Amino acid sequence: MMKGQLAGLMRQAQQMQENMKKAQDALADILVEGAAGGGLVKVTMSCRNDVKRIAIDPSLLADDKDMLEDLVAAAFNDALRKAEATSQEKMSALTAGLPLPPGMKLPF
């Protein structure tokens, strides 16, 4: 490989690294909402998996504690799946054409 080609590859790698960092930073601003119990429990989180808000309908507060805990867990898991899917979608544009192993999640 010639020096010019190597320098070009290094510039491309550096540019891709900068683009990945920008995309990862942008994911912190994208919010998704998971819900359970027909929307009685909602979890809002960023695509960086930071929980921002949990909303519980007041009608559930007098109900069974175990059921409420299950609904919170289900809403959290729903939000997490949505955050992961959104992250993968946003990051896939940056990795198009790269030979990544199947199932590899980004950002790393």
From Swiss-Prot:
GO molecular function annotation: DNA binding
Listed GO CC annotations: bacterial nucleoid; cytosol
Subcellular location: Cytoplasm, Nucleoid
Keyword DNA-binding belongs to the record: yes
Main location group: cytoplasm
Keywords: Cytoplasm, DNA-binding
Pfam families assigned to the protein according to its UniProt record, in alphabetical order: YbaB_DNA_bd
Superkingdom, taxonomy of origin: Bacteria
InterPro entries assigned: YbaB-like_sf, YbaB/EbfC
Record's function text: Binds to DNA and alters its conformation. May be involved in regulation of gene expression, nucleoid organization and DNA protection.
Family of the protein in this entry: Belongs to the YbaB/EbfC family.
PANTHER family the record matches: NUCLEOID-ASSOCIATED PROTEIN YBAB
Assembly notes: Homodimer.
NCBIfam families: DNA_YbaB_EbfC
Protein name according to UniProt: Nucleoid-associated protein BAV0915
Source organism (scientific name): Bordetella avium (strain 197N)
